[in-house]
Design a protein with these regions (language model features):
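Two-component/phosphorelay signaling modules centered on CheY-like receiver
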Residues: 10-29, 94
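Conserved acidic carboxylate
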Residues: 7
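The feature encodes the CheY-like receiver
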Residues: 56
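Alpha4 helix (beta4-alpha4-beta5 surface) of REC/receiver domains from two-component response regulators
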Residues: 62, 83-100, 111-112
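Acidic, metal-coordinating helix/loop segments flanking the phosphotransfer/catalytic sites
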Residues: 30-48
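Short amphipathic alpha-helix used as the core "switch/output" element in two-component signaling
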Residues: 61-72
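Acidic catalytic/metal-coordinating carboxylates
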Residues: 33, 59-62
Length: 117
């Protein structure tokens, strides 16, 4: 799968990139904020976006809306440490492909990726 990473934390970005590559996926772009995410999506046309929920400037929810304005079928995995039922309901209502909770294990990540195929 071709993946765009949208995450402001360099260590988390590095970790997700390494796990994706270990599982045979291609990271086609990285972004740290909303404008870079939308630009990266438009330029790279990824199969899926890993999107942090809390980013500088715009929230992940706002960026999700921006991505869907570019491509209503955009597949997005939200990455977050926030555990709230209301957030989960909102994300599910917005049609995210999955929610990846931080911290996560390799097995958690592998299972998530297997379910996305």
């Amino acid at each position: 799968m071709r993946v765009l990473l949208v995450e402001d934390n360099a260590l988390t970005r590095y970790t997700i990139r390494a796990l994706l590559e270990k599982l045979g996926h291609e990271v086609v772009g990285e972004a740290e904020d909303g404008p870079a995410a939308v630009k990266g999506y438009s330029e790279s046309k990824p199969d899926i976006v890993f999107l942090d929920l809390i980013l500088p400037g715009k929230s992940g929810l706002e960026i999700l809306e921006d991505l869907r304005a570019v491509d209503p079928a955009a597949r997005v995995v939200v990455v977050t440490a926030v555990e709230q039922d209301e957030i989960d309901r909102t994300l599910n209502d917005k049609g995210v492909a999955a929610i990846l909770r931080k911290p996560f294990s390799f097995e958690d990540f592998k299972a998530l990726m297997s379910g996305l195929r």
